[in-house]
Amino acid sequence: MTTAHQDITQLGALDLSRAIHTMQVSCREVMLATLAQVDRLNPQSNAIVSRVDSDVLLAQADERDAQLARGESMGWLHGVPQAIKDLANVQGLRTSLGSPLMKDFVATEDGLMASRMKAAGAIAVSYTHLTLPTICSV
């Protein structure tokens, strides 16, 4: 089902959305490729600081595939994995805002950005690293 000779993780957002919606690639395949990429690169880059459990992510991807099979799409981000900066609440993820003081805070609900991305079909995979000086400079 994957696009021949093309690494899924190298597709841009629009091309990935198009491939998912035309069923050239499944949401599960996209998620598996994304998780493999994170597992391969994160030990060196330390970009991902909090991640949703793989089984939960694959179940969400399977649900997105089932929706497409029924002719339903949530929007152009349908099934597209998203890493969100550790600045916006994502329900169930540890949200530190880059501060050691917040290291144990777990969001009980999605913030505006995450809820809009999810409403458009995105699957929130993880938080990306954020340092406190980043927030202070905004």
What are these regions (language model features)?
Residues M1-Q60:
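An N-terminal boundary/leader segment
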Residues D15-L16, G71, L112-M113:
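Residues within well-ordered alpha-helices
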Residues D39-S45, G71, N89-T95:
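Secretory-pathway/luminal and periplasmic proteins that interact with or process carbohydrate-rich
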Residues D62-R64, N89:
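Glycine-rich loop at the start of a catalytic domain that most often binds anionic cofactors/ligands
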Residues R64-V80:
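Immediate post-signal peptide segment of exported/extracytoplasmic ligand-binding proteins
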Residues W76-L130:
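Short glycine/serine-rich loop/turn segments
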Residues H129-V138:
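Single conserved hydrophobic/aromatic residue that forms the stacking wall/gate
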